Amino acid sequence: MTRSLKKGPNVADHLLKKIENLNSQGEKRVIVTWSRGSTIVPAMIGHTIAVYNGREHLPIFVTDLMVGHKLGEFSPTRTFRGHAKSDKKSRR
């Protein structure tokens, strides 16, 4: 079930304040955040947001196609190292 339209998007207050301050000053800086559940709103377009994935902050440049998605969708938390290779020498 999707979020009700009357509630509006879920964006962390501290993150929205930082974005609005940078927009009013006309600056573009990397914004560091741990808020993976925040929804990307049109005010964030053009900013680079470093989202925490549990180990490091991954910089994400926000484009207009990302609006409506969550920040956590663009910083994967798991590293896939490939499936186990079949070792034919140990089978003999």
Curated annotation (Swiss-Prot):
Domain of life: Eukaryota
Keyword Chloroplast recorded: yes
Gene: rps19
GO molecular function, one term: rRNA binding
Family: Belongs to the universal ribosomal protein uS19 family.
InterPro entries from the UniProt entry: Ribosomal_uS19, Ribosomal_uS19_bac-type, Ribosomal_uS19_CS, Ribosomal_uS19_SF
A GO biological process held by the record: ribosomal small subunit assembly
Entry-linked Gene3D superfamilies: 30s Ribosomal Protein S19, Chain A (3.30.860.10)
UniProt keyword terms in alphabetical order: Chloroplast, Plastid, Ribonucleoprotein, Ribosomal protein, RNA-binding, rRNA-binding
HAMAP family in alphabetical order: Ribosomal_uS19
Task of the protein: Protein S19 forms a complex with S13 that binds strongly to the 16S ribosomal RNA.
GO cellular component: chloroplast; mitochondrial small ribosomal subunit
Localization annotation: Plastid, Chloroplast
UniProt-recorded name of the protein: Small ribosomal subunit protein uS19c
Pfam families linked: Ribosomal_S19 (PF00203)
NCBIfam families: rpsS_bact (TIGR01050)
